[in-house]
């Protein structure tokens, strides 16, 4: 990344990642591929296409409609964001089975960007502090 951003006068520091994405909340336990047959799941894109090949029925539902759809049984499962956000929306109350990882959505690396000219002006000890902080962010979010 540093080589890429060099042309823009920036220096990049890896500073964490978004973590593993989850596979979704399910009203019923998934024990085999056969359990996907007829399963109505809020999921889109490539993942929806793949799960459809397994017999699932992908559903396009807005984020705010997921909880009531799970609660009423309009859908059987839903993939959304991740543990923190999903729990805040209460999915665990209406769909007790939570599976991981979400193979269809890899995590993203996060970076702190600094103007190269300003970086060059910093005293060595500030550079060391900044570099160490970025490394700690990456280490702390690795798992």
Q: Could you say what each language-model-derived stretch is?
A:
Residues 1-143:
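N-terminal secretory/targeting leader peptides
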């Amino acid at each position: 990344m540093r080589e890429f951003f060099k042309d823009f006068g920036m220096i990049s520091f890896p500073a964490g990642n978004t973590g593993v994405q989850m596979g979704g909340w399910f009203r019923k336990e998934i024990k085999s591929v056969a359990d996907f047959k007829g399963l109505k799941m809020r999921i889109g894109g490539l993942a929806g296409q793949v799960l459809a090949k397994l017999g699932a029925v992908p559903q396009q539902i807005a984020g705010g409609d997921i909880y009531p759809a799970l609660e009423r049984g309009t859908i059987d499962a839903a993939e959304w964001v991740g543990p923190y956000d999903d729990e805040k929306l209460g999915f665990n109350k209406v769909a007790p089975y939570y599976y991981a990882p979400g193979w269809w959505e890899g995590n993203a690396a996060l970076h702190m960007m600094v103007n190269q000219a300003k970086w060059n002006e910093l005293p060595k000890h500030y550079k060391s502090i900044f570099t160490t902080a970025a490394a700690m962010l990456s280490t702390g979010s690795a798992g």
